[in-house]
Amino acid sequence: MSSYTAAPLKFPRSLRIIKSADYGVLVHTRNENTFRLTSKYFSINAMKFPEEPGRLRFGITVGKRNAHRSVDRALVKRTLREAARKQAPNLAALLGEQGVGLDVSLRLRVPLKEIPGIDQGVNALKLSLRTDARSLMEALLKRFPKQLAQTRGE
């Protein structure tokens, strides 16, 4: 047996949006501090908080309309959590430099049955979801400094 112990892959409570009221504000507010990003399968609603520098929280929702079975919803949530967890350190560093906080809502925007790979087995589906989630999080990371520059009038 190897003595190697993997670091726990956690998504701590401090990184999560917990209250439904916070989700409501994030999804329904439209102003200069909010923006949206979409990919093939997922969408992001994000809101900047200039008064809370360095704060980063993620909320993940997968509706029954898009993924009927609970096992499928859990798979999509795990995939989104993994993508968010991997980009969180980079995004948190960027937020710290820029002096703002950010709340991000991630959600599945298309029915799972429309995703290529659903009929080829769970591994193909996981690959499709993982690839799209990763590209969406990278787009968030790339776009965020541009959003700040536009807000500040630079």
Predicted segment positions?
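Positively charged, solvent-exposed patches that mediate nucleic-acid binding
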Residues: 1-154
